[in-house]
Amino acid sequence: MTIDSGFNHITVLLDEAVEALALRADGCYLDGTFGRGGHSRLILSKLGPQGRLLGFDKDPQAIATGQALAAEDGRFVIVQRSFAELGAEVAARGLHGKVSGVLLDLGVSSPQLDDPERGFSFLNDGPLDMRMNPDQGISAAEFIATAPVEEIARVFKEYGEERFAGRMARAVVERREKQPFTRTADLAEVLKVANPAWEKGKNPATRAFQGLRIHVNNELGDLEAGLEAALDALEVGGRLAVISFHSLEDRIVKLFMRKLVKGEADNLPRNLPVQHKVFEPKIKLIGKAQFASEAELKANPRSRSAVMRVAEKLR
């Protein structure tokens, strides 16, 4: 996630994430979530002439920023694809199993969140969109207009962890029958009224909006696919660093890494004769989970939920 402070984009866990990759001057690296390029620029500053960096993003504004960087630095290439598709891109470039490190900085960036026209925020009124790539998939407004009440409730509960999901979904459906939702502030107001127990210091629409955004962009599905693709792309000794911003993301990352540290025995029937190597771990964890420092928290309050996990490929 990139924090936007006025006109300055401040990347969360910038130094920590780049350090975690243990960069080699001639290595090949992937930034799966280019954003506004904070991590990528620091990586490039540490690579030598033979180093390479491939950036991915779905957002057209991020791609424009990446294209400008690519024009300045021939070691960098930007690709408008989800990091879930990095396997195909890596294979097409002949880099499968040759990548030295992959960085995934998950979630929505502050420039996206703070731009009302992107439709992510309940604080700034804008069109109810929420798509990372406005040219692909259905918008939040389209989903809200057509989904059954049970599906809306599931999205609020499963992806937003909203305990009043059913009540809020029913309020949405009741209102849409009279007038469709097209604006973020309109939806936020209905959710606000339908939520009977506000959390201190948190907008009552927060969890439902998170659920909608995750669903519209298939964020958790992309994460699961992206983790597998990243591991396959890495060379032995290559590193994977993942920064997540809410418990659903972090749970997926943690379980993925835990499974690979233990080996694959948990996935096999008991007493099945297998070769010993099946039980050997595929990765090792590098340190413990890292969080934003006190100084970073003070400068960027949105970094408070950031957690980074790092692993190294063993085989």
From Swiss-Prot:
Could you identify this protein by its name?
Ribosomal RNA small subunit methyltransferase H
User: What does this protein do, in the record's words?
Assistant: Specifically methylates the N4 position of cytidine in position 1402 (C1402) of 16S rRNA.
**Organism the protein comes from:** Pseudomonas putida (strain ATCC 700007 / DSM 6899 / JCM 31910 / BCRC 17059 / LMG 24140 / F1)
One Pfam family this sequence matches: Methyltransf_5
Gene3D superfamilies reported in the protein's UniProt record: Putative methyltransferase TM0872, insert domain (1.10.150.170), Vaccinia Virus protein VP39 (3.40.50.150)
**SUPFAM superfamilies, per the entry:** Putative methyltransferase TM0872, insert domain (SSF81799), S-adenosyl-L-methionine-dependent methyltransferases (SSF53335)
InterPro entries linked? RsmH, SAM-dep_MeTrfase_MraW_recog, SAM-dependent_MTases_sf
Keyword list, A-Z = Cytoplasm, Methyltransferase, rRNA processing, S-adenosyl-L-methionine, Transferase
Q: Which reaction does it catalyse?
A: cytidine(1402) in 16S rRNA + S-adenosyl-L-methionine = N(4)-methylcytidine(1402) in 16S rRNA + S-adenosyl-L-homocysteine + H(+)
Superkingdom is Bacteria
Q: Name one GO cellular component term.
A: cytoplasm
Its subcellular locations are: Cytoplasm
Gene name as annotated: rsmH
